[in-house]
Amino acid sequence: MTDGLQWDYNCSVDVLSAWIGTPEPCDEVAVDDSVVIRISRKTYQPVGIDIRFASRRIRWTGALDGSLARALLHQHGPAAMNIWQTSRLHR
């Protein structure tokens, strides 16, 4: 699910963003106050994540990289898919 993961950390707003592949139309699913998963409208799979307050999730900010995004995408991806699928049923 996370092969080819690219990431960027914006320290001025403390947001770690990660994505797979090229940008495409997505639906965003907030799984908690600081994590948003992006679901592809084409493949119906998680293709990105935004992590607000990313530095709070790790002790050393030098470790804010793709491994944190990859771990959180694996952790929250299934819940995001459930939320997304439920929301599509009610449209």
Tell where the protein language model's regions lie, with residue ranges.
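A short, polar/charged loop-to-alpha-helix boundary motif
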Residues: 56-68
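Cysteine/selenocysteine-centered motifs that mediate thiol-based redox chemistry or coordinate metal-sulfur cofactors
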Residues: 70-91
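Short, acidic, Ser/Thr-enriched surface-loop or helix-capping motifs
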Residues: 10-11, 40-41
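Short, aliphatic-rich beta-strand segments
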Residues: 15-20
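A short acidic/small-residue loop/turn micro-motif
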Residues: 24, 53-56
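Short loop/turn motifs at secondary-structure junctions and domain boundaries
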Residues: 27-31
